Amino acid sequence: LLFDLMRGHMDELLAALIPKGIAGAEAAPIERLERFVRFHIHFHLERPDAVFVSYMELRNLGPENFAVIEGLRRRYEDHLETILKAGAADGSFAVPDSKIATLAVIAMLTGVTTWYRSGGRLSGEDVAGLYWEMVRRAVSA
């Protein structure tokens, strides 16, 4: 059951990401990064329970199921790392280690579900905008 919930979340996340054109090279890295940040925030704010299970219960999976979920997470993280590497290559981002930057950004973005409450002081769009500004400043050259 736990594996099925996690697999469903990751499959849904990856399926929703692809049509957004985030990983494609047609846009500048800064535009792709903004799309990624906003997508991640909105997707996760709509599913806080699934996010909690998917990120906090990984340790409770057996080795085979852990490897499957870890592979799906890696595929998702690779989209962000590709953007960060492209931005570093064109001089718009300063990320000395793209993998560490990827993990740091993902952790920051995913953490929003621990405190955000619908109907609170900020809308989901407000939060996405604030997080985008923080991420942009963190990686800008």
Predicted regions mapped to residue ranges:
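Short helix-capping/turn signature of helix-turn-helix
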Residues: Y55-L61
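C-terminal alpha-helix
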Residues: I83, M134-A141
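Amphipathic alpha-helical packing segments from all-alpha helical-bundle domains
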Residues: G8-I18, E64-A89, K99-L103
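An amphipathic alpha-helix adjacent to DNA-recognition modules
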Residues: L1-I18, E34, R38
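Amphipathic alpha-helical segments enriched in hydrophobic/aromatic and basic residues
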Residues: L2-H9, V51, I69, G124
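Hydrophobic/aromatic-rich alpha-helical bundle segments in the mid-to-C-terminal region
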Residues: V51-Y55, F66, A88-E133
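Hydrophobic alpha-helical connector segments
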Residues: I18-D49, T102-V105
